[in-house]
Amino acid sequence: MLLLITGASGMGKTTVRKIVAAQFADQLESAELAEVAGPPEWSLRWRHQAVEKAVQRAVKVQRDGKHFLLCGDPVPPAEVYAAPSADQPESIAVCLLDASEDSQRLRLMDRGDAPSLIPNHIAFARWMREHIANPRHRLDVIKQGGWEEMQWDRWITATDQQKAWKSHRIDTTGLDPVDVGELAATWIRQQMLSIRHQPHFPNKKAPQPGLGSKQALPAIPRLW
């Protein structure tokens, strides 16, 4: 199974990854995009290609009997589902780390982010919030200038199947990082327990032996 814990900047992705990776060390492998795709080029095309490499890693880890967690980058769920190899993991599950705009702004200021970029991060958080609720919302934001190998048609078909779009939101506003980590860990446990009852793509090929059975707005500033 591929688990995606995502969110805009300032939502606590890196901290959460450290917490859950330690708890599930014997059950899952975790990584950020740069760890599977090399130094970032900060382009949409690079991110799409990096997501595909992460999906391929998830498939490899799956063959070894573990799950794979992608956490640490602001990856929109649609990019995972549209990756060329996204029909190969036994399941995909998405968790969005979110927070109020005031909370996000304070976190970004406290960690020293450039004030001129903070409105961009907040706008992207709004987009991500809508994206997990409405998978087809403003897909132009992540399609234009992207990698031509992305399977967007397959992605649109998948969103017609309610069970193919599994997302969960954790509101981190006012929460201690450890508490957020525990909420994320609880979500991971729930996904592991229910994986056999969560179909991925409806017309997916039968798994190979050993693999198991298996969301008029202003323009959104790009952060990549």
Predicted regions and their residues:
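Glycine-rich phosphate-binding loop used to anchor ATP phosphates in small-molecule kinases
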Residues: 49-91, 96-101
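Conserved substrate/cofactor phosphate-moiety recognition/catalytic segment
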Residues: 17-59
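Small-molecule kinase domains that catalyze NTP-dependent phosphoryl transfer to phosphate-bearing small molecules
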Residues: 114-180, 201-202
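P-loop (Walker A) phosphate-binding loop of NTP-binding proteins
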Residues: 8
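Hydrophobic anchor at the beta1->P-loop junction of P-loop NTPases
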Residues: 5
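ATP-binding Walker
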Residues: 11
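Walker A/P-loop
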Residues: 14
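Positively charged N-terminal leader segments that act as targeting/secretion signals
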Residues: 205-217
